Amino acid sequence: MKGQKLFVRPIEASDFDAVRAFAAQHGGSPDVRSGLLGKLVGELVSVLAMEVEADTVRVVDLVVAEELRRKRVGRVMLNELATLAAKLERNWLIADVKHAEFLRRVGFTEDQGVMKRRVG
């Protein structure tokens, strides 16, 4: 990944088959309808499933191809989600505490059983 730029964009209907194939290979939900995908050199390497709520954007799932884990892909995906949340005028990203250690490293804090990160 060094020297390569991760291309992140919203998931579109035309991506559903690729997202399903990615989930079959790397885990995660095969039925993501709302979220972001990350590509390196045209290859799908990450899928972030999300739900937009009243004041927040919820991270439902974040899957990175195993060979690219711990290479900042997850961090980039969450930063792009924060940018999108700000455009949607949402104040918080929230996520399950399942991956609390990683989420703390990327700016989340635990509050009342969920991980939260202020947007903006």
Q: For each predicted feature, which ranges?
A:
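A short, internal acetyl-CoA/4′-phosphopantetheine-binding micro-motif in the GNAT/acyltransferase core
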Residues: L62-R69
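Conserved active-site alpha-helix within GNAT-family acetyltransferase domains
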Residues: D96-R117
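Conserved GNAT acetyl-CoA-binding A-motif
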Residues: A85-K98
